[in-house]
Amino acid sequence: KGEFRNIDPTKARVILVDGAEHPLPPFGEQLGHKTEEALAKLGVEMKMNAFVTDVDSEGVTLKYKSGEDERIESVCKVWAAGVSASPLGRALGEATGAEVDRAGRVTVNKDLTLPGHPEIFVLGDMMAFPGVPGVAQGAIQSARFAADTVAARLAGRKPRATEFSYFDKGSMATIARFKAVVKMGNTKMTGFTAWVAW
């Protein structure tokens, strides 16, 4: 309310569609429910456990995990879906015989190299590595690891580490003006305090 001067909030609907049970699944159930409460107070309608199966000029079609379908009439849509891997991943898999997961990410060794190809590193959201989400901190950490390994090889020394280990520095998401959620280790915050931390 008050954010978009040209939109009458009494005539508009904001509908969040998500395939998960609650918003922001990486933040856990507790913060997901807090997010749900905050969005509901803002008048956001939530369609959880639902996937978009069709979008056209007049609306959006959803399919719920339960199997039921729903049509939402809409002239304005905002798509903010997750990331999908680059087509380069599938091409790399086909060219080298490497395993590629459903999302198009390439399975890598513990040192982030392609199985059978120690000269090829696959990094960031193109790599399929257990416990590493497709976010910037995963990409940065994997790039630093690979850079150190390559530099060590060129200098004829051992790398600082022989296996990549991801360190989750935490996640933050802003929900609305002066409202956010933060998860850093065991610390969880919501509301204004989380927004200030963000």
Language-model region placement:
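C-terminal, flexible cofactor-proximal segment of oxidoreductases
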Residues: 142-198
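Cofactor-binding loop segments of dinucleotide-utilizing enzymes, especially the Rossmann-like FAD-
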Residues: 19, 125, 177
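FAD-site-proximal beta/loop scaffold in flavoenzymes
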Residues: 59, 72-144, 148-152
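Alpha-helix termini
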Residues: 1-8, 66-67, 153, 157
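Rossmann-like dinucleotide-binding cores of NAD(P)H-dependent redox enzymes
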Residues: 1-50
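Hydrophobic/aromatic beta-strand patches that form the interior of the parallel beta-sheet core
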Residues: 15-17, 47, 78, 121-123, ...
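A conserved short coil-to-beta-strand element within the FAD-binding core of flavoproteins
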Residues: 48-59
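A structured beta-alpha segment of the ubiquitous adenosine-cofactor-binding alpha/beta core
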Residues: 52, 63-70
